[in-house]
């Protein structure tokens, strides 16, 4: 058997360490996972009720077109139903876009470091990858990205807010960028963390779709909506673009349970508002910690923080594991002296920050 050569240079995506694995490895009873940017407050009670009701229909295939969810979401977003595409998480939409646009004769422009699946899927499609380093402070180098675009560029990825830094692009910055991107290039606006954004200058990306036919916006129910286990994401673009890429989508790619939970979750915006407020309070806890120890914390519009500790990230990562805290080492994210930490509950934040304070004071002693 011959496997595609490009697969030999890839490894499967490595998420944060599983809780049970850490319990077993370190003989711990309590584990706090702050690695995968999950919602520490769970999901809406309405979503739980919808999941329970859907258990009666597990023998029946889901609606492959997600018609009911499509109608609910289109009304909520104030877009045409035909402007939507659904995926098994927004990860699948990244894969669909790469499959639809990229091949060995094309190139794609990617900010770096950013979400690794952009690069991963481009490699599978044998496209040339043009990575543009982030600016100091973690923002996209939009000028550098524009400089990499040529006649063979098919897709440009913009992660806003960016993962793993949490930085955001303003509407004026994004519009100035889009004005200079050639019409033959698809611009993907990955807005996985949009529900957490507080910045007043954050782009109204859906309104931009009217002016830029070469833009698709990706969002997910995995983060603020707390439905990560169910895997449901969505894309919004022009009807023509959605129609063109739909054939690359797998049939029945979002489950009955996922569709039902997402429909219910959309209707509970009080839950989202509550999570946003609690997350903002949590971000302040981390900012105060960084100020106390003179550490640089990247300006986050998400539910995670990236903190530069100016020391080997893996050492701190393993020290926290031994204490029962799972975070992400910046070494695997392109920031070798930083940790990415999900904002948890007030209590979780206080506990891990107390542990980090003890570790830092021990190192400095």
Curated annotation (Swiss-Prot):
InterPro entries: Aminotrans_II_pyridoxalP_BS, Aminotransferase_I/II_large, HisP_aminotrans, HistidinolP_aminotransfase, PyrdxlP-dep_Trfase, PyrdxlP-dep_Trfase_major, PyrdxlP-dep_Trfase_small
Keyword hit for Transferase: yes
Modified-residue entries (N6-(pyridoxal phosphate)lysine), positions: 223
Reaction it catalyzes: L-histidinol phosphate + 2-oxoglutarate = 3-(imidazol-4-yl)-2-oxopropyl phosphate + L-glutamate
Cofactor: pyridoxal 5'-phosphate
EC number(s) stated in the UniProt entry for this protein: 2.6.1.9
Pfam families: Aminotran_1_2 (PF00155)
Pathway where it operates: Amino-acid biosynthesis; L-histidine biosynthesis; L-histidine from 5-phospho-alpha-D-ribose 1-diphosphate: step 7/9
UniProt keyword terms in alphabetical order: Amino-acid biosynthesis, Aminotransferase, Histidine biosynthesis, Pyridoxal phosphate, Transferase
Cross-referenced Gene3D superfamilies: Aspartate Aminotransferase, domain 1, Type I PLP-dependent aspartate aminotransferase-like (Major domain)
Coiled-coil segments on the chain, per record: none
Molecular-function GO terms, alphabetical: histidinol-phosphate transaminase activity; pyridoxal phosphate binding
SUPFAM superfamilies listed in its UniProt record: PLP-dependent transferases
GO biological process, one term: L-histidine biosynthetic process
First and last residue of the signal peptide: none
Xref: PANTHER family: HISTIDINOL-PHOSPHATE AMINOTRANSFERASE, HISTIDINOL-PHOSPHATE AMINOTRANSFERASE 2
Recorded family membership: Belongs to the class-II pyridoxal-phosphate-dependent aminotransferase family. Histidinol-phosphate aminotransferase subfamily.
Assembly notes: Homodimer.
HAMAP family named in the record: HisC_aminotrans_2
Name this polypeptide is given: Histidinol-phosphate aminotransferase
Organism: Bacillus pumilus (strain SAFR-032)
